[in-house]
UniProtKB/Swiss-Prot annotation:
Record text on subunit structure and interactions: Homohexamer. The homohexamer assembles into an open ring structure.
GO biological process: DNA-templated transcription termination
Name of encoding gene: rho
EC numbers: 3.6.4.-
Function: Facilitates transcription termination by a mechanism that involves Rho binding to the nascent RNA, activation of Rho's RNA-dependent ATPase activity, and release of the mRNA from the DNA template.
Protein name, entry field: Transcription termination factor Rho
Keywords per UniProt: ATP-binding, Helicase, Hydrolase, Nucleotide-binding, RNA-binding, Transcription, Transcription regulation, Transcription termination
Cellular component aspect of the GO annotation: cytosol
Annotated ranges, domain Rho RNA-BD: 77-152
Binding site for ATP: G200, K201, G202, Q203, R204, A205, R212, T213, G214, K215, T216, V217, R243
Amino acid sequence: MNTTNKQLTEELNNTESNNDHNDFAENNIINLKQLKRKLPEELQVQAEELKIENISSLLKQELVFAILKKSVEQGGLIVGDGVLEVLPDGFGFLRSPEVNYLAGPDDIYISPSQIRRFGLRTGDTVEGQIRAPKAGERYFALLKVNRVNFDDPVNAYHRVHFDNLTPLYPDEKLGLELENNSKDSKDFSTRVIELVAPMGKGQRALIVAPPRTGKTVLLQNIAHAITTNNPEVFLIVLLIDERPEEVTDMQRSVRGEVVSSTFDEPASRHVQLAEMVIEKAKRLVEHKKDVVILVDAITRLARAYNTVVPSSGKVLTGGVDANALQRPKRFFGAARNIENGGSLTIIGTALIETGSRMDEVIFEEFKGTGNSEIVLDRKIADKRIYPAIDITRSGTRKEDLLVDKIILNKMWVLRRIIDPMGSSEAIEFLLKKLENTKTNYEFFEMMKSPERSRNGL
């Protein structure tokens, strides 16, 4: 093991000393990630400055490739990163989240020897120096590995495999509460979730949602709360079979990685994207990082797997193949809190009351697999009350591990008060009380003693 460490360290030192000979100016260093984030109009201006021909006929990825190639010819140094996809032949490519991990001309080639040397696997986020393609080559190639999963490459070789890590119940709270600083603020969704179904790092949560109940907006609010209150968490929003305009809206409103496969793309593409995202998350958890994946929707992902999986000859009610749900269950089941550091949280939406028997079967299969459930109610949404959360049917298992005992007792008192009410009256009652306070702590302070609270807050 020590010999391997020595070899890896020597390899890194050698490549670093080689780089010292490349005395490039700061403005000659091109960051591939920053280049991919630019708008097509900005790339066209940069291409014109480099005197690249036929700019208007090039797609964005082709434009990035042309700019990189021209910059290298003029003495530039390229630094790039991406998520590794290892192909059956042994070599791999770094795919970019900016293009939803689609294969493209600007992908970075990694040789089988580099993959073996650093113990790389599909899903690893690799960063390093790259070179332009030589004569007869089609892709940029990785010259030097600087970091693996935002960590030293040597550590990647000795990490414990995800499947060998010990899963535990979530015991560290994932703060979702956003303070209401003004009386005009009407969004109390994350505060309601904190009261009825608190989330922890490593939670496997299901948002059960009929159509038009505000599930996408709820996910946006959760994403915003996570990035605001938990900056150490790596957030990925996975949109499967969604409308393109909703993808754009999510990208503009969420400060995190948003990847998508829209409804006009084939089922195989939905599956490939989901596999890349879950593998990336697993690799980060192996490095003791906290990852949160928001999935919209798990039902559509299960439909995609049902289309892609080879037919077993056994078909369940609604046209679901008997083997089709095994892989989406493995995706959802990957969420866990890890002993000695690291966690993977998955919050996914499950569609119900769509009129499709298949969706009902998928939901029934996933029901009970999560350890937290938020149920949205169509009747509440029809009254234009948001969030349309059915408080009595929503909850978290082992919530005593996440919440202070005094607060937990007050949460139970609140449930006893709300229980006799209908779902609409319950959420209206709670929202009215939350409007008068900035935080949930203030709300609990307003509550009377448990004995007197049974008659109302």
